[in-house]
Amino acid sequence: MANLKDIRDRIVSVKNTRKITEAMRLVAAAKVRRAQEQVLRSRPFADRLARVLENIQSRMSFEMADAPLLKTSDLKTITLLAVTGDRGLCGGYNSNIIKRTEQRYAELNGQGYKVDLVLIGRKAITYFSNRSSQYTIRATFTGLEQVPTSDDAESITTEVLAEFLSQSTDRIEVIYTKFINLVSCNPVVQTLLPLDPQGIAEADDEIFRLTTKDSRLTVEKGVGPANEQPPLPSDIIFEQSPEQLLNALLPLYLQNQMLRALQESAASELASRMTAMNNASDNAKALAKTLTLDYNKARQAAITQEILEVVGGSCT
C-alpha cells in the first residue's frame, strides 16, 4: 500500500504542477500578443526617422567626421551589449544569447581586439559575473519593464553613448533575440555604433538599416514591416541647419533602435516562455496519465493479492 500512496502523491503533485504551468502559459500568451503588436508598431517610426536622416544628410556638404556618432576609427576596443531576461522558465532563450555572446567574444578576441561586456538582464549578469576572471564587464542593467519603455532604452543608450563618445570603445554591437514569430526566435548580432559598418560586422543586419555608403547616409533594404512607408517629399524645408538636425536626431535614432532591440527581446522571451510552458503542460498531462495507469495496475495487483490470500486462508 505504501507504493500505492507514493504513486497517488506523485499524481497529485504532477497535476498541481500542470495547473501552474498552464497558468503561466496563459499569462505569457496574453502578454506576447501585446509585445508582438508593440514590435510591429515601432517599425514604421524607425523607418521614417531613417529616411528623414538620409534626406538631411543629402543636403550636407561637410565630411562625416563632423558627426561624432558617424566617426570611424581604428578598431581596438569593441563592446558587446548582451540582452537577456531577469527570469527563467523560458526554454533556451537566455542560454542561446549567452552562448552567442561567448562565441562572438571568442571571435573578436581571436582577431586581436579588446572586448568589453555591457549586460542587460539578471541571467547574463549572473553567468558572466561568475566568470569575471575571463570577461571584462563595463556596466549592467536589471529590473527593466516586461514591456520595455523609452526610459529603459534611454538609460542604456546614455551609457553606451558616453563610452563611445569618450573613445573608451571604438565599436558597440548588440546581441539580442530577433522576434520572427511565436515559434521562431533567433539570436543575432547587430552593429549599434558607429553607423558605418566595417569588415567584422555581421551579415544579418536587418533592423539597424541606417548605414553609410560613399560617405553618405543611406537606408538598406531588408526585412521590415509589410506596409511600406510612402517616400518623403523632396521639397521639405528645415529651419535648422542640416548639421544641427543630424546631431540632434542621431541620438534619437539610436535610442529608438535600442528600444526596438529590447522590444524584440521581450517578445521573444514571452514567446519562448509560452512554448516552454505549453510543452511542460503537455508533458505533465502525459506523465499523469502514465502514473494513473501504474496506480490502477498496482491497485489491481494489490486487490488480487488480497483475494488470493483470503481464498488461500479459507482453503486451509
Curated annotation (Swiss-Prot):
Keyword annotations of the record: ATP synthesis, CF(1), Hydrogen ion transport, Ion transport, Membrane, Thylakoid, Transport
Major localization class: membrane
Compartments where located: Cellular thylakoid membrane
Transmembrane stretches, start-end: none
Any single Pfam family the record assigns to this protein: ATP-synt
Segment forming the signal sequence: none
GO cellular component terms, A-Z: plasma membrane-derived thylakoid membrane; proton-transporting ATP synthase complex
Domain of life according to the entry: Bacteria
InterPro entries in UniProt: ATP_synth_F1_ATPase_gsu, ATP_synth_F1_gsu
GO molecular function terms noted in the UniProt entry: ATP binding; proton-transporting ATP synthase activity, rotational mechanism
Membrane topology, record value: Peripheral membrane protein
Similarity remark: Belongs to the ATPase gamma chain family.
Functional summary from the UniProt entry: Produces ATP from ADP in the presence of a proton gradient across the membrane. The gamma chain is believed to be important in regulating ATPase activity and the flow of protons through the CF(0) complex.
Subunit structure: F-type ATPases have 2 components, CF(1) - the catalytic core - and CF(0) - the membrane proton channel. CF(1) has five subunits: alpha(3), beta(3), gamma(1), delta(1), epsilon(1). CF(0) has three main subunits: a, b and c.
Protein name according to UniProt: ATP synthase gamma chain
Gene transcribed to yield this protein: atpG
